[in-house]
Every structure is written in structure tokens, then in C-alpha cells.
A protein has these predicted regions:
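Nucleic-acid endonuclease domains
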Residues: 1-72, 87-284
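Short acidic loop-to-beta-strand element that houses the catalytic metal-binding Asp/Glu
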Residues: 69-82
Length: 284
């Protein structure tokens, strides 16, 4: 089974910066977002030198589910993490999550996932691994791998706020509401009764390079910057971690550092974690 260690080792051994030259126009990949997602898949299956048939077999071997643009997650590793891939076009911009708040853990009973995802394998919950790529034109400038449990608060934090807003909207007098999973849906607003209003939440979250700037800073003179943060509990569960340790020892541009990160539910508490950082040369 593949995991984050395999992906990081593959990235260090195969640093690809130009997504356009590598992916666009091939295999129905027509935009940078799709190219980034395919790149992430290739990291987990070591798929850069595989032909399409070999790649399909590797996907089947390592992934139980590949998703769509409407429902999380983007992919699930067999017996492993759920993965969400997010593209950012500006180095410091926030990430739009649209109508769903961040999830620390993905559960099989989540109303956000598809029936196919729920039955893709025998599972109850999965760690959520967010993969953030900063893309400038055709080039991948930075990539971050961060587990949501180290990045987002418990679901109750977001759900409580959402329900308070929803309740407040529904107490407005003189309008006709209809049941909805959104914050509100109001019917027949105008005299003809032909206009409706949907009230939707639009969630944003700061990108991880800003959130974790107290333990990692990008060097903008580099053509490519990479960071991954893995809490110690997860790190100890990764049985192939020695493979990455050995690779980093022989890679001048890579480092493995012990750090302390803030608990997303209580920033007064710190937890031990590993920071993996890597860079590629000077930018042109």
C-alpha cells in the first residue's frame, strides 16, 4: 500500500516543475488543475515513467477511489489516507473551500461523499491529507502536504457557527423558507412570486504556507519549494519512514526537522511533528 512516504520519496527523486510540458494536452488533461491532480496521483504510484496501461494498473493497485469535482475526496488510498488536491494561483492567497468547511477526519457516513466512495473499500474513517499546489502559469512553484487534523479544527467548531447562522436566517419574518442543507432558501421574494434566493456559505482557509510560517519559510529565489508536515503519531505509524530518512541523508536539498506545531483546537497546546522540506535550484 502506498502512503505519504512513497509520495515524498518520489517527489524528491522526480522533481517536476513544468506541469504544462509534462501533462497538458496528453490523456485529455486540458487544464492545470487536472494536471496537478494527475501529478499527485503519479507521486503515490511512482507513475512518471509508466505508459497509460501500466499506469491504470498501478492506480488500481494503490487507490480504491478517484473522485469528482463536486464531492470530496479527490482520491483515496487503499487502506490509507483520503486526499484532497487544491490549486492556488497566488503565493499568499487563501484557499476557497466553497460550501464545505474543512474536515479534520473523513468518515464513511459523511453526507458530502458519494455512495461509490462509501463502498469503495471497507472503511469507517480516513485521515485527510491536503495537497496544496501553487501554480504560476505552467509551472508548479510550491507544494505542501499537510494532514487536516493538524490544520483544521474539529468539525463541531465549524458546524456550530454554521447552525447559528442558519437559525438566524430562518428567524427572519415575512419570508417563505423551504427546507435546505444550505444556510437558507427563500421562495417567492417578489410580487409575482417568480424570484427565489439561496443563501450559501463560502468557506475560505489560509493556505498552509501562511498557517505554518512559524516553522517553515519558502525561499522565493528557488524554482520550487516543498514542505510536508507529519505529526509524530502519524509518523510512527508509517512503517517505511526509514526509506525517506535514508533518502534525505543523501539529498543536499532536503531536510528532516523535528518541530512543534499548534493544536488547531487549542493553540496554547503544541504537538510534536516532523517537517520535511525540499527545494529545486534557483528560479530563472
Amino acid at each position: 500500500m502506498s502512503n505519504i512516504i512513497n509520495a515524498i520519496c518520489c517527489l524528491i527523486n522526480n522533481p517536476i516543475i513544468n506541469l504544462q510540458a509534462t501533462y497538458l494536452g496528453r490523456n485529455r488533461i486540458n487544464n492545470v488543475g487536472d494536471a496537478l491532480e494527475r501529478y499527485v496521483q503519479d507521486l503515490f504510484i511512482n507513475g512518471f515513467n509508466l505508459d497509460e496501461n501500466q499506469r491504470n494498473l498501478a492506480i488500481r493497485e494503490h487507490f480504491s477511489y478517484l473522485g469528482n469535482t463536486s464531492n470530496p475526496p479527490d482520491m483515496m488510498l487503499k487502506g490509507g489516507d483520503a486526499i484532497e488536491v487544491k490549486k492556488i494561483e497566488s503565493k499568499n492567497s487563501d484557499l476557497a473551500l466553497n460550501s464545505s468547511y474543512p474536515k479534520a477526519i473523513l468518515t464513511a457516513d459523511s453526507p458530502m461523499i458519494t455512495a461509490t466512495c462509501k463502498t469503495a473499500e471497507n472503511w469507517q474513517q480516513k485521515d485527510m491529507l491536503y495537497v496544496f499546489g501553487i501554480v504560476n502559469g505552467e509551472n508548479l512553484q510550491a507544494l505542501a502536504l499537510v494532514y487536516s487534523v493538524d490544520y483544521a479544527a474539529d468539525e463541531s467548531v465549524y458546524e456550530t457557527i454554521k447552525q447559528r447562522i442558519k437559525t438566524g436566517v430562518e428567524t427572519i419574518e415575512g419570508v417563505e423558507f423551504t427546507p435546505t442543507k444550505e444556510l437558507g432558501k427563500i421562495k417567492r421574494i417578489d410580487p409575482l412570486g417568480i424570484t427565489n434566493l439561496r443563501v450559501r456559505g463560502m468557506w475560505h482557509i489560509e493556505n498552509p504556507f501562511k498557517v505554518f510560517s512559524y516553522v517553515y519559510e519558502r525561499n522565493f529565489d528557488h524554482a520550487f519549494n516543498f514542505m510536508a508536515i507529519i505529526n509524530d503519531e502519524k509518523w510512527q505509524a508509517l512503517i517505511n519512514r526509514q526509506e525517506l530518512i535514508s533518502l534525505i541523508e543523501h539529498t543536499p536539498n532536503a531536510q528532516l526537522i523535528d518541530i512543534n506545531i499548534k493544536n488547531p483546537n487549542n493553540p496554547a497546546q503544541l504537538k510534536s511533528a516532523k517537517l520535511i522540506q525540499f527545494f529545486v535550484g534557483e528560479s530563472a
